[in-house]
């Protein structure tokens, strides 16, 4: 568990929290809780490394769990690139997203932000700055398998063609 207070907010993170949902044990990769005054925002987190894909079954299960627990969101992280900010990486019943938000971050996006923060000294605390730089080193290391992508996926074909044809 990590706690970090900033501007009246309190951030708590949990690794592999365990829940019982529909008579089975469910263990997402993480849980993030942000408190500000009496307001609380909570999200389940599912992370995939390398080329491991997110599955609709798993993401839908976490959306159902988040709804049952009264959580606000499910955050997925993978190497999958999406064509827009509101796109989701799997095909699930969108009606289940009425009360629970589903947000996706790619490792490329996370790496870009981490490098930017690290290069421009956006982190004041020396220990946190060191941890961030080590995280960037990990993200860039060949063994992490998070240092880029080989295929932008089918959603990007229209963008490529639009640039090529000058129709964007």
Language-model features: where?
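Charged, terminal alpha-helix-loop-beta segments
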Residues: 1-168
């Amino acid at each position: 568990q990590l706690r970090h207070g900033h501007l009246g907010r309190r951030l708590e993170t949990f690794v592999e929290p365990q829940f019982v949902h529909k008579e089975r044990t469910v263990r997402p990769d993480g849980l993030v809780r942000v408190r500000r005054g009496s307001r609380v925002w909570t999200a389940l987190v599912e992370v995939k490394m390398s080329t491991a894909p997110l599955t609709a079954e798993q993401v839908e299960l976490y959306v159902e769990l988040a709804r049952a627990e009264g959580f606000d969101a499910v955050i997925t992280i993978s190497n999958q690139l999406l064509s827009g900010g509101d796109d989701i990486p799997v095909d699930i019943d969108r009606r289940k997203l009425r009360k629970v938000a589903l947000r996706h971050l790619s490792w490329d996006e996370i790496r870009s932000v981490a490098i930017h923060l690290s290069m421009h000294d956006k982190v004041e605390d020396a220990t946190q700055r060191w941890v961030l730089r080590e995280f960037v080193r990990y993200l860039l290391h060949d063994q992490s398998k998070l240092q880029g992508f080989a295929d932008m996926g089918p959603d990007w074909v229209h963008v490529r063609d639009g640039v090529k044809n000058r129709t964007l």
